[in-house]
């Protein structure tokens, strides 16, 4: 629904002029401009300036603005997350490579991946990637956090922050919370192929796992993945944290505002932030959001943009900064290093003709790709059915070797045959099919993610221009163990697909195809088709000392060498958790907000007893 131009006072500072809120359709998304009438952010000073309006920022904005004496500003480059494609889980098919709500980023050319660039989906809206991800809610395992080896961040330390943040709809349940803002629930879409997949997985020896977030038992097994949804609607942090706080007079949100630099003054007592420079358009004026005395800048731009902006502001490896003519404020070699992700591959099989209609897309579209009114009605009146799913909320966590202490593989099961072995491109190809009036074929897809990959990449500078994307070296398979994991993953997926009762539905394997039979064949297939699981972390890692590559202190998330500057987003995670990273990002933000407000740490009340 389009909104006409109007003036509102939502979020206006008491005594300030009302904000103009003009809505217009841009690239299929409603763009909502929220800003002070006197200028993009006005002339007032802020206690907290949040750079980026993504997953962590929305949490912080809510929690910090709860103190009416603190003025909080959020700067977000993209639009709001109000678009229908964001709210409806099935709208994910329209969000990949979206011209407005995605950053459109790719890695540098990867020689080891047959000279391919890897597309990296990054949400560009209020809510960030929590508004464009698969809505899967996974914390990883207790062992993931214990492996960090950081005081205050063990599994015992973080567990109650996970529970505090959560509002689990199907509770009460052990290891889950019901009083938080982060809505979670069990999937609200069922397909006969889900049960057949479970039976086939059981036939290979996998156990059933009733709750992948219950740390009282191992992560292994097959089952439903809990989702970040509320009654079938996406529950990103924009909806669950930021929107409920928007009426507060001490909170200001500016969209279409791209941060270009953190302003840092160097003095005799050291370096300190004074504010943030930003632009409303690439070649337009630059504005400054100024800090009040004692104020802080909180970097919440994610694992790509946070290190990028730190380097542009003089915080990073001195050699890199000097190469691009940037004055060095704090020589931190770890900025942009330690990039980690979940590399993914696909196994897909086409259904026999009599079972073509079992795919999730066949429940939404007819043979000519016209949307079915029944699916729409089911969603509108029940908030259930194929529109209530991103397609991959059932699956398994598996160990590809008996020597492993915990799963290294996540299988995401999709009732439908992938159109391209690059899982992301399947959605783009589907868009072309829709234009031609052709449907997505029936069958199954198993997206296979190396969830505890060892390879590490980096974020660097291409230029000292904030509007030129950084150099992203994703560096998959720099550790050959990750390639071996995915080779074994394809073999395990084939084993499951060959079991009854799943086997009876399938006609032929389309990807990688039966001709890819040897390990060498599978390695070649994976190098040509591996894609991102969109779980980037680690590029401003927390730790005890910059000498060990840390960028921020694990004690308080402060950037080493700069006063008034902290990082609160997925880039601080020193090692990637074995599951989707949204839950861990919210956990970090909840804890950071409590730290900033001087609130006591929650005393751990649960003891994880298994990995």
UniProtKB/Swiss-Prot annotation:
Q: Where does FAD bind?
A: 55-56, 76, 125, 129, 133-136, 582
Name the SUPFAM superfamilies for this protein. FAD-linked reductases, C-terminal domain (SSF54373), FAD/NAD(P)-binding domain (SSF51905)
Annotated control of activity: Activated by blue light and repressed by red light.
Instruction: Tell me which residues bind hexadecanoate.
Output: 392, 412, 427, 447
Catalyzed chemical reaction(s): a long-chain fatty acid + hnu + H(+) = a long-chain alkane + CO2; hnu + hexadecanoate + H(+) = pentadecane + CO2
Enzyme Commission (EC) number: 4.1.1.106
What GO terms in the biological process aspect are recorded for it? glycine betaine biosynthetic process from choline
Where along the chain is the transit peptide annotated? Answer: 1-36
| Practical use | May be used in light-driven, bio-based production of hydrocarbons.
What does the record's cofactor remark say about binding?
A: Binds 1 FAD per subunit.
Question: What cofactors does the UniProt entry give for this protein?
Answer: FAD
* Stated pH dependence: Optimum pH is 8.5 (with palmitate as substrate).
Name the domain of life this protein comes from: Eukaryota
Which coarse location class describes where this protein primarily resides? plastid
**To which protein family does this belong?**
Belongs to the GMC oxidoreductase family.
Q: What's this protein's name? A: Fatty acid photodecarboxylase, chloroplastic
Organism of provenance = Chlamydomonas reinhardtii (Chlamydomonas smithii)
The encoding gene is: FAP
């Amino acid at each position: 629904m389009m909104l006409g131009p109007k003036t509102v006072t939502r979020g206006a500072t008491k005594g300030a002029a009302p904000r103009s809120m003009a809505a217009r359709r841009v690239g299929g998304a409603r763009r909502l401009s929220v800003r002070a009438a006197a200028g993009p952010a006005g002339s007032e000073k802020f206690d907290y300036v949040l750079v980026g309006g993504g997953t962590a920022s929305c949490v912080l904005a809510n929690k910090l603005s709860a103190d009416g004496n603190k003025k909080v500003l959020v700067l977000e480059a993209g639009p709001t997350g109000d678009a229908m494609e964001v709210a409806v889980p099935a709208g994910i098919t329209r969000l990949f490579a979206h011209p407005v709500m995605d950053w459109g980023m790719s890695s540098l050319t990867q020689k080891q991946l047959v000279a391919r660039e890897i597309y990296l989906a990054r949400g560009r809206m209020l809510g960030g990637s929590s508004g464009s991800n698969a809505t899967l809610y996974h914390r990883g395992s207790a062992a993931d956090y214990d492996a960090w080896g950081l005081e205050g961040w063990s599994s015992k330390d973080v567990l109650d922050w996970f529970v505090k943040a959560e509002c689990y709809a199907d509770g009460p349940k052990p290891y889950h919370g019901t009083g938080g803002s982060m809505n979670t629930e069990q999937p609200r879409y069922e397909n006969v192929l889900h049960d057949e997949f479970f039976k086939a997985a059981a036939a290979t020896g996998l156990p059933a796992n009733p709750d992948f977030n219950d740390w009282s038992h191992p992560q292994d097994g097959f089952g439903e993945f809990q989702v970040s949804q509320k009654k079938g609607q996406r529950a990103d942090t924009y909806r669950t944290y930021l929107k409920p706080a928007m009426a507060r007079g001490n909170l200001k949100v500016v969209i279409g505002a791209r941060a270009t630099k953190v302003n840092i003054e160097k003095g005799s007592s050291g370096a300190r932030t004074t504010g943030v420079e930003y632009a409303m358009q690439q070649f337009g004026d630059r504005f400054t959001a100024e800090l009040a005395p004692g104020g802080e800048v909180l970097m919440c731009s994610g694992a790509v943009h946070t290190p990028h902006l730190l380097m542009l502001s003089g915080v990073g490896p001195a050699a890199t900064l000097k190469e691009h003519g940037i004055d060095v404020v704090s020589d931190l070699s770890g900025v942009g290093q330690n990039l980690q992700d979940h590399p993914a591959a696909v196994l897909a099989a086409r259904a026999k003709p009599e079972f073509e209609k079992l795919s999730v897309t066949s429940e939404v579209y007819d043979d000519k790709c016209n949307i079915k009114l029944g699916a729409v009605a089911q969603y509108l009146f029940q908030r259930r059915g194929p529109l209530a799913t991103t397609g991959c909320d059932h699956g398994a966590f598996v160990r590809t070797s008996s020597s492993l202490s915990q799963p290294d593989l996540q299988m995401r099961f999709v009732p439908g045959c992938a159109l391209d072995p690059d899982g992301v491109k399947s959605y783009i190809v589907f868009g072309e099919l829709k234009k031609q009036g052709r449907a997505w074929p029936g069958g199954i897809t198993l997206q296979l993610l190396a969830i505890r990959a060892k390879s590490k990449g980096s974020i660097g500078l291409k230029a000292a221009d904030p509007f030129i994307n950084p150099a992203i070296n994703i560096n998959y398979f720099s550790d050959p163990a990750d390639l071996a994991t995915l080779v074994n993953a394809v073999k395990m997926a084939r084993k499951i697909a060959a079991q009854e009762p799943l086997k009876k539905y399938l006609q032929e394997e389309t990807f990688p195809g039966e001709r890819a039979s040897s390990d060498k064949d599978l390695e070649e297939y994976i190098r040509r088709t591996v894609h991102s699981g969109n779980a980037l972390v680690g590029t401003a890692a927390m730790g005890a000392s910059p000498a060990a590559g840390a960028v921020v202190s694990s004690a308080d998330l402060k950037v080493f060498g700069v006063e008034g500057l902290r990082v609160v987003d997925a880039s601080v995670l020193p090692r990637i958790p074995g599951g989707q990273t949204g839950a861990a990002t919210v956990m970090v933000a909840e804890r950071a907000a409590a730290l900033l407000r001087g609130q006591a740490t929650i005393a751990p009340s649960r003891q994880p007893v298994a990995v």
